[in-house]
Every structure is written in C-alpha cells, then in structure tokens.
Amino acid sequence: LNGKSAAMMLALSLVNVTAAFAQDDNSSAKEEGNRNVMLNAASANGPREIQIGLPSADVNVLENGLPVTYATNPHSVNTIWRGDASLSHQGLLKIAETAITTGNIGYAVNSFTQKGQKGFNGTLNYKSNHFGLQEFSLNMNGDLGKDWYYSFNMYQDFDPGTFKIKSTPYQDRTQIYKALLTKKYNGNRGEFTAMYKYANSHNVYNYATQSAPFIYVGDGSVKEYGNFKLGTTSYLPIDNEMTYHDMRTGELKQTSLYDACLNKASEVTLMNNYRFDNGLNWKATLKYDHSRGAMVYQTPMSIVDLKSDANKGVYNYMYRDIDGAVKAYNGQYVQTRMSCLNAGKIDEALFTTELSKKFSTSTFRLGVNEWFYHIDYCSNTTMYDQSVPADGNYALRIWDANKRDSYFYDFNKNASEYYKGSENKLALYFTHDWDVTNKLNLYYGARLEWQKLKGENAAVKNAKGEFVGRFADYNLGATAADGTKIAPADLSYNWLNYDFSVAATYKLTDNFGFTGDFTYIVQHPKFEAFAPATLPNTDKISVPLGRAGIYYNNSWLSLTSLFSYISKTNNNSTLNLQHGSEIKAAPLTYDIQTWGWTTDAVAHPFKGFDFHFLFTYQKPTYKKYETSITFSDGYVGKINATGNIVAEIPQILIELDPSYMITKDIKLWTSFRYFSKTYANINEAYYFNGHWETFGGLNWQATKRLALGCTVVNFLNQTGAKGSIAGAELITKDEAKGIK
C-alpha cells in the first residue's frame, strides 16, 4: 500500500549573496524551459520525474557533463547531489540531447558546479519548515591571484520528514562537501579545475514513508483506516533492528535500518576547457568515484484478516510488550513485509571529452564517452509480520507462534539479489545544429556505443538446465532441495548500441511555424538487470520517440502543440505474485507504447504577470504482457495485461504556473499539477482517482544581498493514495467489481 503524503508544509529560505556568479555556457537549444523540475511534492530536495509515457524511472542528473551516478540502484542521485548553493547552473536537457550524449532515455537535469570568481563571493541558503527541517547550503569562492581560483561548498540536511518515526530522528540526514581549485592559463583561453567531493547520506525516507494502510472504497477513492492519518502517521514498526542472512557468506547477521541505508561517496573530478585560435572549443572531464551505495526497502506484501471465517484458529500471533512479556495479538489485521537491504561497493571512472565549433549558421560537436563501472552488490531479504494499528499508534512486530518463535523468516527467499563485476561503455557521438535558411532549422545527431559487461551473478541452473530460483536461507554455497550447489554463474556480454535524433523547425511566418523531432534509441540491459534468480531477456531494447506539431509566438504568448508517439520493447521486470500466504517471483519481458498530445504555453498578458500552462493527454498500453507462476498447492497464477493501460501512469497531466510581481522586489507564485486516474494493478481491477499537487509561495528580494522566501506545499490539503496495492497483482476486474 502506498500512501500519498498530504501534510501542509511551510518552508522558509534565506539567501545571502555578495557577488553575482558567472554561469556556464549552456545552449538553450539543448534544454527545456518552464518545467520546475526541483519543485517536487514527493521530496523536499530532489528532482521530480517528468512523465514521457513510460513507467516511472529515476531522473537522470548530470553534473559538469557527467552522470552524478552511473547506476541509481543502489546509489541514488539524492544521496550524492542536491540542487544547492554549490551549483552555478541547473537546467533540463531535452530528450534528444540526453539520448545522444548519455545513451539514456528521458529528460536529464543538467547542472554545473560553481567555480571560483574574481574577488570574494559567498552564498548561504537556509531552509526550515514547521516540522523541524534544518537545511544549510554554503558556497564561498574567490581568487588567489595569478589566475588561480578556489571554491568551497558545504551542504547539511537535517530533515525529520512530515511525521515522526521511532527508529531515527531524521528521515533524511545528508552532508555533502566540495572543494575546487581552478587555474586559468594561456591568456584565459584555457581553464583547468580539480574538484574533490565527499558525501554521506542516510536516505531513511526511502523505506519509512512509502506505504500506509487504507480502505479501498471501490470507486477510486480511499478511506482512512481507523485513526491512521495518511501522510502524517508512520506505518513503520518501532523496532530499528533487522536480522538478515548474508547472501555472500550464509552468516546470520544483525544491523539497524539506519546503518543499512548509509551511502558514502568520495570523488575526484578533473575538468579542462580550452578555446583554440581557430574557434575550436575543447572540453574534457574525468571523474573517479569510490563509494558505498545503499537502498533499503520495507515492502508491504499482503494483509491477513485474522477475524475472517477462513482464518479463525489458523494463526496465533504474539508480541512483546514494553517489559518484554509475551502477549497475544488481538488486532484484526496482520501486515506481512519484506525487508530488502540493497548495498554495493562501487568504483566508477567516467570520462567525457567534446570538440565543438560555431560556424556562421551552425554549431558542430563531436564527443567521446568512456565510462567504467565496477560493483560488488547484493540484496539481503527478510520476511516479517507487523500489526496494523487502527488507533493510529506505532506498529509492532509480531510473530505466528504456530509456525515460529521469532520475528524473522524466509531469509533471501523472495527477492534476494547478487551480482559482481564491471560494465564499460565506450561511445562516439556528434550533433549538428544548423540554420539551413532564415526559416528552417535542423538539429541532428547520432551515437554509437560499445557496451561490455563481465562478471558473475546468482542465476543458477540445475542439472536439467532449469533455473533453481531462490529458497529460504539462500546464499552462495548453499544447496538447493534438488542437490544443486549454489555457486556464482559467470557473465560476459558485448553489445553495440546506437541512437540517432533529428529535429526540424520551419517558420511559416514570423510568428507561426511547424516543429517536429524523432529520436531512436537502441539499448541492452544494464548490469543491474542480472540481479534476480533468472537471466533477463538480452535482446535489444528499442525506444522510438516521434513528435510533430505547431508553434506560435508573439509579444505576449509562446505556444507549442505536439502529437507524440513513444514505445519501448523488451522491458525486463519481476513480479512478486501472491496466492494465499505464499509469494513467488515471476520474471517477464514486455513492451509498451504510448500515443499522446501535449500543448505547452507561456503567456505574459500584462506587466508583472506570467502564466505557464501545460496539458498532456496520453494513452500508455502494455504489449506482449503475459506471465504465469505455479504455487506449491498447484494453483497457477496467470496475468495477461496486453492492451491494458500501464499501471501508475496517468492519462491526463495538467500544469498551471501563474506568478505575479507585486512590486519589483516581491513575487507571488503558485503551481498546480493534476494527475488523472491511475490503475493500481496490472489487470485494471483497482484504480485511484485523479489528484492535484499544489505549491505556492512569496519571494522577496529584501536587499541587494538578502532574499527571503516562504513556500506552502499542498495548500488544497488533498489526501489519498497513489501507486500500487500490495498483493493485488492477480486480482481481476470481475473479482474487484463487488468491492465497496
């Protein structure tokens, strides 16, 4: 069950600036505007995902032209990057630019670190809210003489979240430090920068805030369960300790959830820019990162109704009170959870270099990526049960005395993962932005990439050539029921990936014209796709994206309206299907396609007032989505979702962003985002009604050096649920008809 945070939030930010910062040269042709990517209802300090008609994915983030992290599992972006005072520029790369320069799908946040400038300069950002958030961001930079410059950055986040949890005082405790030394040389035509970054983050919010119990009414709405308040009540058990079975050694170990989600990174980055006499520009950036990445999940699996006729006398749940005495649990419901402790030791070396030159009517760019990634990763899983408190109190861990005498069971049985080795990508790409005539602009580019993957995983086969799958107490060195010894399986793949993109804009008149673009991306699975108990489909993944439409510009209005098509083949996924109290993993490969229409407008109807409007209608559907799994009692769970609307993706998206300058120093703004009905399971049996996300604020440039801001999140005070309903994957429309 996924609960939608619905609390009213008030934030205050303060900025002290002693000098204007220079901004990196970033062509507007590469970036989107008007998207407010850092205005995120799901996170106080991370970028939001922008829908492109495909299932949810992590936001791509670049810093100084390189990915902040090569793979977001287990090292998420938000643990090593923040949109803070250390950045001189933040933008949003277009889909085509992201595809050509990185080989990835979707938009990408494009950021650059603040380098030293002449004189002494500083920025201090402070943000707080009525829940107790304390966030500090400091940049100090200046020159040392003889063309040497320095820049120091510190970020500190103490975020208790929107509700209290017992396991830790903070849902986000992050600290990031950066130090840069820059030397300009050869008459300022060249610039060399060395940067060191250290990050330490506990991303508790990833497991502490992602689920809640509620009553599904049947009409797309939900009711709160008892006194459990959605968005303000913690559904996490009081206990912070977790027992797990080490996937690598088989040892039984214990850790705290807070310690398990520790992320650390130590990075060295070297950057060189040089402008030749003939107008040629050369950029080169090299980054080495040694880190520990971690993602902890406490995934709700199923809810058991102890008071139902079928379950009376079947279970005997117990708990320990504050004195340690064992007592019977008399609640109506039991929540089963799967704890996933994902962690990996990471070494990555990323190098990108580009040559570019501006001509009278065009700009040409040639680039090379050499990206190396090494990881030793595993996910240790543990099952446990907890109470479902109707009184709004904290949940307790409980156990079924008829089956066991401790909280934890089925170690590594359901979704445990292991892989170790390296992935290397060597790519050559080019782009050409060309004003063919004063009416026609062409942008085109291509990327050719060699992907090499070598290592080992735990997709083990038996003597019959069948995958063994996971079982209780699974680890490397264990023996399966059929006698198969669990030993690492070697992996070795070499693939050729390629992308190309072309965009055209034709001015029919000074104000009106036609625009269109087409991007085609060919990928193969990343290393993380080899984590489960079976091998993924290693066929090529194709993503064509085409858009075509019109634009209109005048002195007060800028409007674009486009029809679009996007599809993706060979999506690898694993479903945890539930039948009774049994949970089994079902791997599958499927396709997706989405048709859509988007209209985007920015208006300035009168002095001081700006208005941004975005409307999208899209129809994302599954293709070739079929799988089945046989449970221990012989029941065969089948899913055929071909033709269904993709779960968790809305068909209508609306963004409204009005703002008004009350005076030349005071700005009043709001932002409204509407997400229409989304399906909560693959069979379209359950759905959630549409909802609004709302933001509003007042910004005041009090003096030349002081800016104040006040922001309110969710001022419409909407509550409800979004995402999926745990354990509902096999429920059909007919079975859900009678729910009220």
Task: Annotate the PLM regions.
Residues 121, 147-150, 187-192, 279-282, ...:
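Repeated loop/turn-to-beta-strand initiation elements of outer-membrane beta-barrel proteins
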Residues 169, 182, 191-269, 294-340, ...:
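Acidic/polar loop-and-plug regions of large Gram-negative outer-membrane beta-barrel proteins
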Residues 255, 539-548, 601-606, 610-612, ...:
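Conserved C-terminal beta-signal and adjacent last beta-strands/turns
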Residues 346, 358, 363-373, 378-382, ...:
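Structural signature of Gram-negative outer-membrane beta-barrels, strongest in the C-terminal barrel
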